[in-house]
Structures are given as structure tokens and as C-alpha cells.
């Protein structure tokens, strides 16, 4: 078992084993269908990372109800961001047509999302 420095900088804590399982949507009711997967006991301890709209990402982090509305595609799991044990987290890909350039603003929003995910883990 390996150890990492704890949050206080002095103690050590066991490293958590994290598995990343990429998925591709190939149809309903099977791996890749986040709406189906998140309801399966096999994935009860999984954090689903989905493509989010920047507007709804910001709404969620501002505790606005629209930040928990289900979206299309893999954003169907957006409501699972809520509660005391979040099961989903979004990474903004823009609004509408998506981000066209990796500007300082875009990098900042993506970094915010990755920081939030890191804290969940």
C-alpha cells in the first residue's frame, strides 16, 4: 500500500485506488449509456464525468436549481451531482456549439471543474 501526504501536510493517508473506465455510447441499456449505468448496482461507487454546458455548470456551483436539470446525451446524469454523495460531475464543453478556442477563460472553467472533481475523489 502506498501513502500520500495528508491535508494538514504532516500526516499520511493511504492512497485511494481510482480506476478510470472510458465508455462510448453504442445504444440504450448497456455500458456507455450513463442513464442506464448510473442505476446499476455495479456502478454504485462510480463517479460519472459528463460533458456539461458552461451555463448549467455555473448554475450548479452557484446552487441554482437549473444546475441539476437533466440534459441530453451523457448530461442526462446531471441531477446526480446533487445530494450528500454526488454520483456525477460535469466538465464544461461550452454552450451551444461548444468552445471554439482554448482561451484563458475556457482554461479557467475547465480547471475549476477538474478541481471540483479532485475534491470529490
Question: How does the language model describe each region?
Answer:
Residues 1-121:
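Macrodomain-like recognition of ADP-ribose-binding/processing modules
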Amino acid at each position: 500500500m502506498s501513502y500520500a501526504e495528508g491535508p494538514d501536510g504532516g500526516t499520511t493517508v493511504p492512497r485511494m485506488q481510482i480506476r478510470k473506465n472510458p465508455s462510448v455510447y453504442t445504444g440504450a441499456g448497456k455500458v456507455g449509456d450513463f442513464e442506464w449505468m448510473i442505476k446499476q448496482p455495479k456502478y454504485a461507487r462510480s463517479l460519472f464525468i459528463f460533458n456539461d454546458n458552461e451555463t448549467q455548470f455555473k448554475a450548479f456551483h452557484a446552487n441554482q436549481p437549473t444546475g441539476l436539470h437533466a440534459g441530453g446525451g451523457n448530461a442526462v446524469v446531471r441531477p446526480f451531482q446533487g445530494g450528500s454523495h454526488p454520483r456525477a460531475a460535469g466538465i464544461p464543453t461550452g454552450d451551444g456549439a461548444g468552445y471554439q478556442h482554448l482561451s484563458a477563460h475556457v482554461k479557467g472553467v475547465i480547471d475549476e471543474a477538474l478541481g471540483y472533481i479532485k475534491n470529490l475523489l
